[in-house]
């Protein structure tokens, strides 16, 4: 099964639909170039200054000290399409950890109150200007709670996508995790990771 756009419960979403304008209190960093990892991180922290392209590039270089970077390769490597190791190291600089979620587990055991947000890696359509190409590429997105509701803060969206409460969030996560090549990271404070208190079954 491929990762298709989240539709949710149509009847429920129509009855609880929010105004079209994005709530002003939500920070939603939009896609530019291929900086989806940067956008996902800043959207998780709800802070445009949490990380910069230069910060992530420095982390990449630290993790790969033997990489010979010519000006041409530096441009390629700095395109923002960073792997999970860069994201995990970036979170650690802020006192947070990324917990990889085993897709065989039930998302019902996630202690949502102890999770700041989620970063997902899933296939996304490639676009050339206004044209959507018949190709897929892995893409980082952020999902988190703001003002008592959960939102999909995918940087490719024009505005935050309202998911709903905890029950709707779990349905959203289950839906995507059933798909091929979809992975989930739980963003939690260091002490939560140390005590595994992101789990409701411990």
UniProtKB/Swiss-Prot annotation:
GO terms for molecular function: cysteine-type deubiquitinase activity. It is an enzyme of class 3 (hydrolase). Residues 23-202 form the Josephin domain. Monoubiquitinated. Ubiquitination activates deubiquitination activity in vitro. It is found in: Cell membrane; Cytoplasm. Residues 1-20 are annotated as: Disordered. InterPro entries: JOSD1/2 (IPR040053), Josephin (IPR006155). PROSITE patterns: JOSEPHIN. It catalyses: Thiol-dependent hydrolysis of ester, thioester, amide, peptide and isopeptide bonds formed by the C-terminal Gly of ubiquitin (a 76-residue protein attached to proteins as an intracellular targeting signal). Disulfide bonds: none annotated. The modification Phosphoserine is found at residue 15. Keywords: Cell membrane, Cytoplasm, Hydrolase, Membrane, Phosphoprotein, Protease, Ubl conjugation, Ubl conjugation pathway. One of its GO terms (cellular component) is cytoplasm. Its EC number is 3.4.19.12. SMART domains: Josephin. The active site is at residues 36, 139. PANTHER family: JOSEPHIN 1, 2 (PTHR13291), JOSEPHIN-1 (PTHR13291:SF1). Interacts with beta-actin/ACTB. Deubiquitinates monoubiquitinated probes (in vitro). When ubiquitinated, cleaves 'Lys-63'-linked and 'Lys-48'-linked poly-ubiquitin chains (in vitro), hence may act as a deubiquitinating enzyme. May increase macropinocytosis and suppress clathrin- and caveolae-mediated endocytosis. May enhance membrane dynamics and cell motility independently of its catalytic activity. This is Josephin-1. It comes from Rattus norvegicus (Rat). The gene is Josd1.
């Amino acid at each position: 099964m491929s990762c298709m756009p989240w539709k949710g419960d149509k009847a429920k979403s129509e009855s609880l639909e929010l105004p079209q304008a994005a709530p002003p209190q939500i920070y939603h960093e939009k896609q530019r170039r291929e900086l989806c990892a940067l956008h996902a991180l800043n959207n998780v922290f709800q802070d445009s200054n949490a990380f910069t392209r230069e910060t992530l590039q420095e982390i990449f270089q630290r993790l790969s000290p033997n990489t010979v970077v010519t000006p041409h390769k530096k441009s390629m490597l700095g395109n923002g399409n960073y792997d999970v190791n860069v994201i995990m190291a970036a979170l650690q600089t802020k006192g947070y950890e990324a917990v990889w979620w085993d897709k065989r587990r039930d998302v019902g055991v996630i202690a949502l109150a102890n999770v700041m947000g989620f970063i997902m890696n899933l296939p996304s359509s490639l676009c050339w200007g206004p044209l959507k190409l018949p190709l897929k590429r892995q893409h980082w997105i952020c999902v988190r709670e703001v003002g008592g509701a959960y939102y999909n803060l995918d940087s490719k969206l024009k505005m935050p996508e309202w998911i709903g409460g905890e029950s709707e969030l779990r349905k959203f996560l289950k839906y995507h995790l059933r798909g091929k090549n979809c992975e989930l990271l739980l963003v939690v404070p260091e002490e939560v990771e140390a005590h595994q208190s992101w789990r409701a079954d411990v």
